[in-house]
Amino acid sequence: MQLYVHIELDEPLVLPINYNHIIQVVIYRTLSVMPDYTDFLHNRGYSSGHRQYKMFRFSQLRGKYRIKEKNIIFYSFIELEIRSPEPILIKLLDGGFRYGGITFG
């Protein structure tokens, strides 16, 4: 399953160029309404043999941006795609983003 997120920005969003950890925090914070599930995803995930698999992946942020020093500045909107084979994960994120909003930082 996939979730497409479109966020209208009231003001420019300034992030470090390496912002992936911030997106992960946003995702795990949104999923924290189910602490046991969040803990499972973050600390264990699914395994097959000796390999462990995380149950979601996300795209880079898309939108109009400018690079300034070690930051990336997004203007007007950003878009993000999150994919997972777990329907519950996508539904939790969708509900959390719609009703709880998204905050970076």
For the regions a language model picked out, list residue spans one by one:
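RNA-interacting cores
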Residues: 1-105
